[in-house]
């Protein structure tokens, strides 16, 4: 009996992706082993953070790095660091910031609920452009003597949010001496982003540690300029500033470092090949007269941003002839035991192999076939 059985919690087969609401990812055995080992002794937490930061900086090609309690916490700390540096007097004044420089410029098309984290230290978010785009002039015209940073939400394959757009924004930041904060939480894979984003000259880049890297789900890390990382560390636990509630345990720090050390191009490529095999399995097993199954890439128009360039299987259901809608199929998948979670829109269900465990693709196929077969009988 698993721990979830004992707790009365239904297990989920995750055909959606690295969603926090589903637990992020499954940690590698090596990560779990390292965390168990870390739990057996005390350490100086500042020393551990410093050593972990050096390892992460070497892996990513950044000047410095810091482990956070998720990518959202990294954004909070990044904003605070840009507002105060490592000046203890200024740090202690957050959130009472009267007289502070506190404006962060954000392209309106980048705005999303995660951007609120930038405002937690009482930063003022100044949106520029429209939801459809922005220009260099939009950003430059918004710069004032209160501007402390420019925020950029990175998406690998979305125009205006991609590497080309980031390089232009970084150029503006350098021209005006303003740091650029990049939210790249779920932008792995492709693994090239791990080094490529900070290589643009972006001052701070935040990643999740609990998504494709498969570290603890409640970890993240931020990489970039050494002086700003120093300020982030000053704000963070165990110090009594804005980062105090965002505590990262010794086990989490160790787990993230080990996960990153195993996140190599070779390991990622091996997973990509397996991913492709699963997609082809779905196409072979689920294609029928009334179900078209396509190999597709993530579509930003459908808010599919993570794992860019990696395939998925999209089921297009003939709802009229089958007598069941895609939404009804999806509901039945979730109601089963184990529950199966996959994104659905209109007459389509998308199966993402990213988080599937060995053999789960067979369970998904069996369940979908059973649901569709029963629906067809009911129509008759």
For each feature predicted by the language model, list its residue ranges:
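A structural motif shared across PLP-dependent enzymes of the aminotransferase-like
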Residues: 20-32, 42-51
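Compositionally biased, non-globular sequence tracts
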Residues: 276, 379-380
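Generic N-terminal amphipathic, Lys/Arg-enriched alpha-helix
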Residues: 11-21, 30-39, 309-315
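Regular secondary-structure segments
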Residues: 36-40, 261-264
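Conserved PLP-dependent catalytic core of the aminotransferase class-I/II
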Residues: 59, 264-301
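A common structural junction motif
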Residues: 239-240, 333-341, 369-376
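Conserved C-terminal alpha-helix-loop-beta "cap" of PLP-dependent enzymes
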Residues: 3, 285-366
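Conserved PLP-enzyme active-site core in the AAT-like
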Residues: 1-27, 53-264, 268, 283-287, ...
